[in-house]
């Protein structure tokens, strides 16, 4: 490993001084033999070590052997660090291409990724498993993560057709219009980045040029969602879609007005509705507010009770669960929001300019 470490050092030195370039050539010949598991055919390794130990041999001969060992250990550390760094850079680049973030478990830890909420934030990664002392689990998590990335790679190279990922009883912003392309967004009502994408879509006039539908995806299991009231909101959105699809009295598009309230509106006290649902509202308070919005949309008391019963039904739960299956097994995104439009998958928040360029 010493000749490899020396080559790395000489590579830097040779870039700034010509006197090291001859040594660099010698080091390279040694490295090419070492990486092909052949012994070096020069004395370069010993020459490097002797040049480093010679001053010490004159002053403190007894320290030569420990210093020689330290040089070998340092060389191993340098080479292993390089290999690890190259692996991390390569894996991060692959994740960035596949998922739009270099860290699918924590999208906000990657400065190159678009704003998004992580779907797999609760899953153990290499570092967290290793911190728990689970070495086997750490490597298993790393290989599992890498395998998922490679498994999802082919799908990122295909031409995406949003119509293939529409949920049951899909609802379109502004209603369905013949002749316009279909787009689908994956959203969690509690994710602030979904609100940011929603506002960008409004600013860009994107829904005017597309039949835009959505899949509600409450991150995490129902028993422990990332955002407390997201499963309830997803159930109500789905129940409203089913209700208005059956032409029960209402103005139509009520689910989109609920999303408009959550992503863009504020309470009278100035607190954003999304923050209120996430941090302040109990389940009963959240449900009462959703029902108030239904009343504003033209639902009477009997209609609201019907929606509430439907939202708690197995039918709605099955539709929401199927939407999560579409996201996890077919779209296989690691982030919310995710937009399927213009023949491509767009993870994270999409800018207004980019949205305006999609046709």
Regions found by a protein language model. Name each.
Residues 281-359:
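C-terminal cap of thioredoxin/glutaredoxin-like
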Residues 1-42, 46-48:
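Hydrophobic alpha-helical segments
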Residues 195-295:
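Structural alpha/beta surface segment adjacent to cysteine/selenocysteine redox centers
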């Amino acid at each position: 490993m010493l000749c490899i470490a020396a080559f790395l050092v000489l590579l830097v030195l040779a870039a700034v001084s010509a006197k090291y370039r001859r040594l660099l050539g010698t080091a390279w010949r040694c490295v090419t033999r070492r990486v092909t598991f052949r012994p070096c055919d020069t004395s370069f390794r010993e020459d490097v070590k002797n040049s480093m130990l010679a001053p010490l041999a004159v002053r403190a001969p007894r320290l030569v052997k420990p210093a020689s060992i330290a040089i070998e250990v340092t060389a191993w550390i340098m080479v292993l660090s390089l290999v690890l760094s190259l692996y991390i850079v390569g894996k991060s680049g692959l994740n960035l291409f596949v998922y739009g973030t270099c860290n699918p478990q924590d999208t906000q830890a990657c400065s190159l990724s678009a704003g998004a909420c992580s779907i797999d934030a609760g899953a153990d990664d290499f570092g967290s498993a290793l911190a728990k002392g689970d070495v086997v689990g750490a490597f298993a998590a790393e290989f599992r993560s890498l395998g998922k990335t490679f498994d999802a790679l082919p799908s990122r190279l295909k031409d995406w057709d949003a119509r293939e990922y529409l949920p049951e009883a899909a609802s379109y912003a502004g209603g369905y219009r013949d002749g316009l392309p279909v787009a689908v967004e994956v959203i969690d009502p509690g994710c602030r980045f979904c609100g940011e994408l929603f506002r960008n879509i409004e600013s860009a006039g994107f829904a005017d040029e597309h039949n835009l539908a959505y899949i509600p995806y409450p991150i995490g299991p129902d028993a422990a969602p990332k955002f407390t009231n997201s499963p309830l909101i997803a159930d109500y959105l789905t129940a409203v879609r089913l209700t208005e699809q059956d032409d029960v009295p209402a103005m139509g598009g009520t689910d989109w007005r609920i999303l408009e309230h959550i992503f863009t509106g504020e309470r009278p006290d100035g607190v954003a509705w999304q923050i209120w649902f996430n941090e302040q509202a109990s389940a009963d308070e959240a449900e009462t507010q959703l029902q108030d919005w239904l009343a504003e949309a033209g639902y009477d008391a009997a209609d609201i009770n019907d929606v509430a019963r439907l939202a708690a039904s197995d039918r709605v739960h099955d539709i929401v669960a199927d939407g999560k299956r579409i996201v996890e097994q077919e779209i296989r995104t690691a982030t919310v929001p995710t937009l399927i439009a213009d023949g491509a998958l767009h993870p994270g928040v999409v800018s207004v300019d980019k949205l305006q360029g999609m046709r």
